[in-house]
Amino acid sequence: MGNFHATTIFAVHHNGECAMAGDGQVTMGNAVVMKHTARKVRKLFQGKVLAGFAGSVADAFTLFEMFEGKLEEYNGNLQRAAVEMAKQWRGDKMLRQLEAMLIVMDKTTMLLVSGTGEVIEPDDGILAIGSGGNYALSAGRALKQYASEHLTAKQIAKASLDIAGDICVYTNHNIIVEEL
């Protein structure tokens, strides 16, 4: 069986609000759409944290569980939980094989977490990952910069994924947006 791709996640902090959006498409290999309604963005830690994944679906579930465990262990401290998870992910021979990336955020902090040990906080309050990530990132930056007072974080997140879905064949328009 081929590789499964779970595609685009976009997150934004904007005017005191935060939102994360993900599309619903799961693609096997380069040819077959297997699912249109996957849910790739979740609320964690009593609804105080958002997390979204791009990459292998099975690996993402493992990472969600691991990250939620770290949040519990560090009492909701997002940065500490992300750093400790990245250390464990990078240091464990089996976990290193996982093929996924995560964006995690709370009301004040947004982080990209990867299996190579990176924990990156963006300078501009915007992150995007997955096959349509660059398209969503570009759209989100333009929307945030040029329509800032006219759009909410949720509207920016939704519009950025819509634009990515128009361009990227691995991103669809079944968009789920979560807010904190």
UniProtKB/Swiss-Prot annotation:
Signal sequence coordinates: none
Gene3D superfamilies (UniProt xref): Glutamine Phosphoribosylpyrophosphate, subunit 1, domain 1
Residue numbers binding Na(+): 165, 168, 171
Record flagged with keyword Kinase: no
Swiss-Prot/TrEMBL GO biological process terms: proteolysis involved in protein catabolic process
EC number(s) stated in the UniProt entry for this protein: 3.4.25.2
CDD domains the record matches: protease_HslV
Keyword Hydrolase on entry: yes
Major localization listed first in the record, in broad terms: cytoplasm
Catalysed reaction, written as an equation: ATP-dependent cleavage of peptide bonds with broad specificity
GO MF, any single term: threonine-type endopeptidase activity
Main EC class the enzyme belongs to: hydrolase
Regulation: Allosterically activated by HslU binding.
Record function comment: Protease subunit of a proteasome-like degradation complex believed to be a general protein degrading machinery.
Subunit-level organization: A double ring-shaped homohexamer of HslV is capped on each side by a ring-shaped HslU homohexamer. The assembly of the HslU/HslV complex is dependent on binding of ATP.
Assigned protein family: Belongs to the peptidase T1B family. HslV subfamily.
UniProt name for this protein: ATP-dependent protease subunit HslV
Species this protein is from: Bacillus cereus (strain AH187)
Upper lineage: Bacteria, Bacillati, Bacillota, Bacilli, Bacillales
Gene: hslV
